[in-house]
Swiss-Prot record:
PANTHER family, alphabetized: TETRATRICOPEPTIDE REPEAT PROTEIN 6, UDP-N-ACETYLGLUCOSAMINE--PEPTIDE N-ACETYLGLUCOSAMINYLTRANSFERASE SPINDLY-RELATED
Gene source species: Magnetospirillum gryphiswaldense (strain DSM 6361 / JCM 21280 / NBRC 15271 / MSR-1)
Name of the featured protein: Magnetosome protein MamA
GO cellular component, one term: magnetosome membrane
Domain-level remarks: Protein missing TPR1 (residues 1-41) forms an N-terminal domain of TPR 2-3 and a C-terminal domain with TPR 4-6 which can move with respect to each other, hinged at D-112.
Null allele phenotype: Normal magnetic response, many fewer magnetosomes. MamC is mislocalized in punctate spots throughout the cell. Deletion of approximately 80 kb of DNA, including this operon, leads to cells that are non-magnetic, lack internal membrane systems, grow poorly, have reduced mobility and take-up and accumulate iron poorly.
């Protein structure tokens, strides 16, 4: 595990921030400032890495987020925000098992955190753990009924579990949020097909093809 950020600008910013903090302490009490310099350094470093790592994750700079957040993650002093964003960064950089483990720890620590439930539910769909995804995404959909991605992925999970009626219901809610989303029409059609309802499937297949042709123009 690296002990330094990969970006030189981050390092310069960190020590500038540290220098300003020490300067303020020197103005108040020079002796105490020198005595506490090393502890201040550690405290500022931890806060800086945490904030910068979360910022990287939110901006989609997942490799940079991993470098920063690994410095501050502590399994014994659990910080849900750090674990959540480090978990996301792990998943996005291919370390899916490590990311899922952190997200599961996060939901155990904060079961009512909708953000954590959303990310973990979507991750479960990604890794095809559909039975684990459904209860989380149902909870999230109830809390945030206009989230298209949650409604669509909930439909995907239900469809893969053979719960086609429920899947179609979820897909139709997603379709109400984005009426011209071809993949939703196609998903509804496939669910109907698996139920043997060919007549119900046909208009959705046609609509999906029509939307695909329109987007290709």
């Amino acid at each position: 595990m690296s002990s330094k950020p990969s970006n030189m600008l981050d390092e310069v910013t960190l020590y500038t921030h540290y220098g300003l903090s020490v300067a303020k302490k020197l103005g108040a009490n020079m002796v105490d400032a020198f005595r506490s310099a090393f502890s201040v350094n550690d405290d500022i470093r931890q806060v800086y890495y945490r904030d910068k790592g979360i910022s990287h994750a939110k901006a989609g700079r997942y490799s940079e987020a991993v470098v920063m957040l690994e410095q501050v993650y502590d399994a014994d002093a659990f910080d849900v925000e750090v674990a959540l964003h480090l978990g996301i960064a792990y998943v996005k950089t291919g370390a899916v098992d490590r990311g899922t483990e952190l997200l599961e720890r996060s939901i155990a620590d904060a079961p009512d955190n909708i953000k954590v439930a959303t990310v973990l539910g979507l991750t479960y769909v990604q890794v095809q753990k559909y039975d684990l995804a459904v209860p989380l995404l149902v909870k999230v959909a109830e809390a945030n009924p206009v989230n298209f991605n949650v409604r669509f992925r909930l439909g995907v999970a239900l469809d893969n579990l053979g719960r086609f009626d429920e899947a179609i219901d979820s897909f139709k809610i997603a379709l109400g949020l984005r009426p011209n989303e071809g993949k939703v029409h196609r998903a509804i059609a496939y669910s109907y097909e698996q139920m043997g309802s060919h007549e119900e499937a046909l208009p959705h297949f046609k609509k999906a093809n029509e939307l695909d042709e329109r987007s290709a123009v």
